[in-house]
UniProtKB/Swiss-Prot annotation:
Signal peptide: none annotated. It is found in: Cytoplasm. This is Proofreading thioesterase EntH. One of its GO terms (biological process) is enterobactin biosynthetic process. Belongs to the thioesterase PaaI family. Its main location: cytoplasm. It comes from Cronobacter turicensis (strain DSM 18703 / CCUG 55852 / LMG 23827 / z3032).
Length: 137
């Protein structure tokens, strides 16, 4: 297990109250030994003007997952800050929900790199994102 901080899904979701994460309807759904998952609805909150999932909403889901996963790998007195994010969009989604799966590519003392893959309800890859973070403290 890679996690140094232990939080329940209920506690993870409580951190979203009053934030963009809550506004977008993102909910943490699974904390595995080396992965963090969350879902996000595809609706008017996350659509672009043409009725499809907004790429920025996908990036927000990815950064939410990578940042929280990074935080969970730090010790007391440490935190992580995002330094770079990229997202490749593979497939349009117009309704339902998407699921993001976040796993580490690199966990160093001063930097981390996370891969976040976003799937539609049929399990098809919609977006591949990479988030780099700096470990502070």
């Amino acid at each position: 297990m890679i996690w140094k901080r232990h939080m329940t899904l209920e506690a993870l979701n409580a951190t979203s109250v009053g934030t963009l994460v809550e506004h977008l309807g993102i909910e943490y759904t699974r904390l595995g030994d080396d992965l963090l998952e969350a879902t996000m609805p595809v609706d008017t909150r996350t659509h672009q003007p043409f009725g499809l999932l907004h790429g920025g909403a996908s990036a927000a889901l990815a950064e939410t997952l990578g940042s929280m996963a990074g935080y969970l790998t730090t010790r007391d007195g440490q935190c992580v800050v995002g330094t770079e994010i990229s997202a490749s969009h593979h497939r349009a989604v117009s309704q339902g929900q998407v699921r993001g799966v976040c796993q580490p590519l690199h966990l160093g003392r001063q930097s981390q790199c996370w891969e976040i893959v976003i799937y539609d309800e049929q399990g098809r890859r919609c977006c591949t994102s990479r988030l780099s973070t700096a470990v502070m403290g």
